[in-house]
């Protein structure tokens, strides 16, 4: 497994379906926020994001947002309506916050995936944490 390559690639987060998560035995999905789940300029969760999170939750997958964004109040305000835990100021590509999150929620590396848009932060952090890295294209517009 090369640290220079994502394990799977998708166009957008919505392409990561509950079926894929189940087939891949994913129980914890760590997601980047900016330009992965939302445009950087979006202040509130889009309906598509809320629906996708609910589908994943119904499939038994815990989603935790892990972001390098350091604005705690903004992160909490965004994550609260969709009832998703968030970790801010993650300092990716360092893997500390990823491994802490797995430990805090009692998940093993083989049950965990990091989903993000950047090789230099999200994919590398996943590789350093010894979990799978799934990459989505940089989000440019709301679907």
Spans of features found by a protein language model:
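Non-catalytic pre-domain segments flanking phosphatase-related domains
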Residues: 1-31
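Substrate-recognition element of Asp-dependent hydrolases with the DxDx(T/V) motif
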Residues: 29-45, 49-76
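Structural recognition of alpha->loop->beta junctions
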Residues: 78-91
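Short, acidic/turn-prone active-site loops that include or flank metal/cofactor-
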Residues: 89-95, 137-142
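Conserved Lys-Pro-Asp/Glu-containing loop-to-beta segment of HAD-superfamily phosphomonoesterases
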Residues: 94-119
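Acidic, Mg2+-coordinating phosphoryl-transfer loop and its flanking beta/alpha structural elements
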Residues: 115-143
């Amino acid at each position: 497994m090369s640290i220079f390559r994502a394990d799977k690639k998708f166009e957008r987060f919505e392409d990561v379906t509950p079926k894929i998560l189940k087939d891949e035995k994913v129980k914890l999905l760590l997601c980047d926020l900016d330009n992965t789940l939302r445009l950087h300029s979006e202040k509130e969760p889009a309906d598509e994001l809320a629906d996708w999170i609910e589908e994943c939750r119904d499939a038994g997958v815990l989603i935790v947002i892990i972001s390098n964004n350091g604005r705690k109040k903004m992160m909490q305000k965004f994550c609260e309506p969709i009832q998703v835990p968030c970790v801010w100021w993650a300092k990716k590509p360092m893997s500390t916050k990823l491994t802490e999150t797995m430990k805090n929620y009692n998940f093993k590396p083989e049950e965990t995936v990091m989903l993000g848009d950047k090789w230099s932060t999200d994919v590398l952090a996943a590789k350093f944490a010894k979990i799978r890295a799934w990459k989505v294209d940089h989000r440019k517009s709301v679907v």
